[in-house]
Amino acid sequence: MSAIPPTSNGWLRKMQLGQQYMKTWPIEKQLAPMFPENRIIKATRFGIRFMPPLAIFTLTWQIALGGQLGPAVATALFACSLPMQGLWWLGKRASTPLPAALLKWFHEIRDKFAAAGITMAPVQQTPTYQSLAELLKRAFKQLDRSFLDDI
């Protein structure tokens, strides 16, 4: 695995890990029933794209109509915080070690790569969800869909 996320606890680092995890996770409909990542990633991407303009619109609308500035600022800050919450969740998830059932599945997929004659870098540390995302992305590109049968 190329990028094993460090277990840094800084919130900015979690946001960066979340962005990296969002880019790495394969958005495949077969994974949707088992992992919440598909829904979180779609909602976060939506928030990144539409919440800042919504916040600006809310501020201008409240100010133009002579409304109070306090509630307008609070609404704008809330709208801007939604995509940040998604990135933070994804960053936290990326650095979380895999539970036993997923760890077994992780190694089974690696074994299927070995059986297909595809070399993989050895696992350096305890696999995390980021490691699983990288493995799944590669598996969807290089293996047939039979690796999903074991879920």
Curated annotation (Swiss-Prot):
<keyword id="KW-0812">Transmembrane</keyword>
<dbReference type="GO" id="GO:0005886">
    <property type="term" value="C:plasma membrane"/>
</dbReference>
<keyword id="KW-0997">Cell inner membrane</keyword>
<feature type="transmembrane region" description="Helical">
    <location>
        <begin position="69"/>
        <end position="91"/>
    </location>
</feature>
<dbReference type="Pfam" id="PF04217">
    <property type="entry name" value="DUF412"/>
</dbReference>
<keyword id="KW-1003">Cell membrane</keyword>
<dbReference type="InterPro" id="IPR007334">
    <property type="entry name" value="UPF0208"/>
</dbReference>
<keyword id="KW-0472">Membrane</keyword>
<feature type="transmembrane region" description="Helical">
    <location>
        <begin position="46"/>
        <end position="65"/>
    </location>
</feature>
<comment type="similarity">
    <text>Belongs to the UPF0208 family.</text>
</comment>
<keyword id="KW-1133">Transmembrane helix</keyword>
<protein>
    <recommendedName>
        <fullName>UPF0208 membrane protein plu3094</fullName>
    </recommendedName>
</protein>
